[in-house]
């Protein structure tokens, strides 16, 4: 199994640069350097101007896309790729469910390393099929010809912004015909044509144009309901646990959700969620100490635990000093959309991607962010990137996992920066890899501080 996944990864490394040079500008799913936030900003950029004309929306979803991809079409698209036979074997390998083997004559294995790339290969050309035309192609592509629709796709979810309902109907008809040879159809229950004044949900955000002409992007009502429900379930399950357990469980959920939705108009929703969390932990505290008065409970669990915030109602542990983060502590940022057809695989764009990384501020603590910027995103001991990842997390849960991984993989430690072992020895706080820290303790690294390599931006 491990060898097979490694072979799939090797195949992706061989295929991806070729297809990245071909893929359409507004395809954002499962591609290096692109993600959900780019897709949301692409829609916002198209429809946010007061004189915007593309206000009719085809909101479409493909029915069980991974299960029905046509194998012949995929293999034909790969042309003379040397590992084409390997791809065919993966596609027809079959699945084992409940101990029973079922052969696969269509579809791509979900969870496979190569499956997302296969999906993008199968759906390449969708913009052209919908009638989208650009003034320029390649890296600078992005400005569409007047009168044509704009299609934004993330994997098998897509939004087509059109000038009229008739144009939206035409786009749907064209795409229905184009998808048929690929074995795909629209999900009738999840596909609709609507006007932006009614709002549309996409990738967890609600995008709506209001009567005053403003277009606002907010967390969708369904996303808010889900996080409220999850927080309630988690706190209920923690009855009988101590405050440290509550904080350890809720902090990743809060920071992960806030990190994903920080690019929208989310401040009021963040504040409302903080109120919801406060009520949950207050109820937890009252149930934990049912025989204690309210004043005792609030004095024990609430206070100014975060020294950098003037907030006396932070939930925390008097024993450890750990405290519960708040949604509103995550600043709202404006995401900068990736430019046209730019790809990290293009060596001519190395400076562009380095500049883009430098301008990116990950949702980490102020001290961590300051150290990252001072160190140009690199570990001073091994000179490797500290926050390297193939792509930005694409959901609140992925952000939870990413932030947890960063906490596990990095350490803030005092490092000798000058004159080790001399009277002039200087020590400064640095962010280093956890494994570099272990090696330093074992004598694997010298005590002398190693200067960083040429700055290439934050990972």
Protein language model features and the residues they cover:
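Charged boundary/loop elements
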Residues: 13-29, 449-456
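Conserved polymerase palm-domain catalytic core
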Residues: 22-199, 390, 444
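Active-site-adjacent bridging/hinge elements
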Residues: 88-103, 248-251, 346-356, 408-410
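A conserved non-catalytic segment of reverse transcriptases
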Residues: 92, 182-257
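Right-hand nucleic-acid polymerase module
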Residues: 234-295
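Extended C-terminal regions of large enzymes
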Residues: 274-370, 374, 378
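Short Cys/His-centered divalent metal-binding micro-motifs
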Residues: 384-387, 424-452
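Histidine-centered nuclease catalytic patch
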Residues: 386-432
């Amino acid at each position: 199994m491990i060898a097979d996944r490694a072979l799939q990864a090797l195949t992706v490394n061989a295929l991806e640069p070729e297809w990245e040079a071909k893929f359409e500008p507004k395809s954002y799913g499962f591609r290096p350097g692109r993600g959900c936030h780019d897709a949301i900003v692409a829609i916002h950029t198209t429809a946010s101007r007061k004189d915007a004309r593309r206000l009719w929306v085809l909101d479409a979803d493909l029915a069980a896309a991974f299960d029905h991809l046509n194998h012949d079409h995929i293999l034909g698209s790969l042309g003379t790729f040397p590992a084409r036979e390997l791809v065919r074997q993966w596609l027809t390998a079959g699945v084992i469910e409940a101990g029973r083997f079922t052969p696969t004559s269509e579809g791509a294995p979900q969870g496979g390393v190569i499956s997302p790339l296969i999906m993008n290969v199968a759906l390449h050309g969708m913009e052209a099929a919908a009638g989208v035309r650009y003034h320029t192609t390649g890296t600078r592509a992005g400005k569409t010809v007047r009168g044509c629709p704009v299609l934004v796709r993330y994997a098998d979810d897509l939004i087509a912004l059109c000038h009229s309902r008739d144009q939206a109907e035409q786009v749907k008809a064209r795409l229905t015909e184009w998808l048929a040879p690929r074995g795909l159809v629209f999900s009738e229950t999840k596909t609709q044509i609507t006007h932006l004044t009614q709002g549309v949900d996409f990738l967890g955000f609600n995008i709506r144009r209001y009567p005053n002409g403003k277009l606002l992007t907010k967390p969708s009502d369904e996303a808010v309901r889900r996080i409220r429900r999850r927080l309630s379930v988690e706190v209920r399950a923690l009855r009988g646990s101590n405050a440290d357990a509550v904080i350890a469980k809720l902090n990743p959920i809060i920071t992960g959700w806030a990190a994903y939705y920080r690019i929208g108009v989310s401040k009021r929703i963040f504040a409302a969620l903080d109120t919801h969390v406060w009520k949950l932990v207050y109820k937890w505290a009252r149930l934990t100490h049912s025989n204690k008065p309210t004043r005792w409970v609030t004095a024990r669990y609430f206070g100014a635990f975060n020294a950098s915030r003037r907030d006396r109602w932070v939930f925390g542990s008097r024993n450890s000093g750990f405290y519960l983060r708040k949604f509103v502590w995550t600043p709202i940022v404006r995401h900068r959309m990736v430019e046209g057809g730019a790809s990290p695989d293009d060596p001519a764009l190395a400076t562009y991607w380095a500049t883009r990384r430098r301008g990116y501020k990950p949702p980490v603590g102020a001290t961590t962010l300051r150290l990252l910027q001072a160190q140009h995103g690199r570990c001073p001991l091994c000179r490797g990137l500290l926050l390297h990842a193939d792509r930005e997390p694409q959901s609140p849960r992925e952000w939870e996992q990413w932030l947890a991984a960063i906490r596990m993989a990095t350490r803030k430690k005092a490092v000798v920066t000058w004159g080790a072992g001399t009277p002039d020895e200087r020590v400064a706080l640095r962010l280093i890899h956890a494994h570099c820290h272990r090696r330093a303790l074992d004598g694997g690294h010298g005590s002398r501080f190693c200067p960083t390599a040429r700055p290439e931006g934050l990972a």
